[in-house]
Amino acid sequence: MAKKSKVAKELKRQQLVEQYAGIRRELKEKGDYEALSKLPRDSAPGRLHNRCMVTGRPRAYMRKFKMSRIAFRELAHKGQIPGVKKASW
């Protein structure tokens, strides 16, 4: 499980990105890179890192399910992810 402070920091970054998205888009269209550089660093979408919604793990993230491979495997074995079943051929 990831530290709660890291998960909270990532959530704060996500909120900042959403808050400044319109302003960033307008400044980029104008080409005003001076004003763009004065916005908070964490408002840049490139600073976001995907984290597992269950454990907060930053690595081995599966975008489709928004969780890490470890959490995915556990929940899939329990049958708690709709439409997912173990493959057999």
UniProtKB/Swiss-Prot annotation:
Give the stretches traversing the membrane: none
Q: Which UniProt keywords apply?
A: Ribonucleoprotein, Ribosomal protein, RNA-binding, rRNA-binding
Gene Ontology MF terms? rRNA binding; structural constituent of ribosome
Tell me, what's a Pfam family for it? Answer: Ribosomal_S14
Swiss-Prot/TrEMBL GO biological process terms: translation
Induction field: Repressed by the zinc-specific metallo-regulatory protein zur.
* Function description: Binds 16S rRNA, required for the assembly of 30S particles and may also be responsible for determining the conformation of the 16S rRNA at the A site. Non-essential protein. A second form of uS14, it can integrate into the 30S subunit where it partially compensates for loss of the major uS14 protein (AC P12878) in restoring 70S formation, although it does not seem to be incorporated into the ribosome as well as the major uS14.
Q: Please state what the protein is called.
A: Small ribosomal subunit protein uS14A
Native source species: Bacillus subtilis (strain 168)
